[in-house]
Amino acid sequence: MLNLPVPEAEFINEVLKPSEEQQEMVSAFSERAEEVRASLVNPTVDNMLKITNDGRKCALDQRLLNELLPDAEKSKVNTCVENAFQVWDEGKADRTTQLIFCDLSTPKGDGTFNVYDDVRNKLVARGIPKEEIAFIHEYNTETKKADLFAKVRAGQVRILMGSTPKLGAGTNVQDRLIALHHLDCPWKPSDLEQQEGRILRQGNQNDKVKIFRYVTENTFDAYMWQILENKQKFISQIMTSKSPVRACEDVDDTALSYAEIKHLPQVIRTLKKKWIWMCR
């Protein structure tokens, strides 16, 4: 089997401090979990799944839970915008491209706040032409997707945003990709592999690429990355029993990259004990 080259990745972990509002929300999630466990609330009103979803939204952007909350200056969204703009600016001559993955807060087209529109609006405000930024969700036929992917490969569309289901397997736009951004943490190791497989791919003209992972410290981000690591370890144990040498090398690389961005403060450790069933 041919061992064709793929780009070398530089992993950049952007670990950001939570806002005061986010810290208050995390404390409230713990209280909600206690009430759910004690059956003090109707499960149709609140439950562990709802708390988890709210926790993930809080870690991504506090405005997803309350649009009236301020736009935190050092949020994941604003840090991603800053990085994406810098990469875009540095790659003007070669028309390099970027992918931004975000599984939560996808565009609905109904006027409600979402991360996709917020990112695009801020990038346009910085000077990026709107036609160079695309959402995969706006291309709902195979013909439209093929046209979009061709524009990305040609460097006409230079920033493409999407979710794992829509921008994962089968997306071949690697030609000019220079950077990939994880705005939120996927649920499954295979999702992470699918996302990063878009850029760490044969046919990429760039020898070195950047992969940004954004984590809001002391929020559910840490919990989600911990779950991902636990699942990867389980899969790795199975792999190791089948092929010790090769699997061990793969496991070490994966485990280290997860461990670097894992931050488990006391509140997250407490939630992990309460919700250990979610790792099953």
Positions of PLM-derived features:
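Conserved strand-helix element at the start of the C-terminal RecA-like helicase core
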Residues: 40-51, 93-119
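Conserved nucleotide-binding/hydrolysis micro-motifs of P-loop NTPases
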Residues: 19-23, 105-107, 140-141, 166-168, ...
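A conserved SF2-helicase RecA2
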Residues: 190-193, 199-275
